[in-house]
């Protein structure tokens, strides 16, 4: 991320994982934290995942109801509904706290995450993403309006919905943070910081007080669920 520029307000990108949005109480906690920071003058962009285990439930329902014959393109449209619901709830909750926001849906003309057509594991086309972010998302951030963007979801140049595969919301967050020149990227999960192992499997994993990209890649390769290696392709090198 870029170094803090004293001539402008601090700018952050925050991504909320599904477990942190699992019910109305957790959503309210997340929204209140964002609203509090926004009232300090911080410029914020928010990326949200689907609530709780919504994606798994949609996947199971679609596959079982179709006897496993659902096409990948159709499945992506179904799975995207989780995030498309989350952005609407999050934006409405911000509005209820007096915070101006605007959600970005993948069917909007100014949707910023453009991908190839590898359904279920699509790859963002970075130059197209950055052009859209600079044109449509950045002006909102600079005005103090909070964009709420669906993580995990993309759209092809011919306007078909895609999903980005495992770690897709993190991929969205890294792309937004880099293109917006964010001072900070915050990935909010249900773990207490970045752990050396999955705390749901290992009873006493170590909490890592500081971390570099090489270590993140190692954790990703080991199967640690904090972040997926694909998302790290899009991390700012700074």
Predicted regions and their residues:
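Nucleotide/pyrophosphate-binding catalytic subdomain
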Residues: 1-234
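Short, intrinsically disordered, charge-balanced linker/junction segments flanking boundaries
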Residues: 236-238
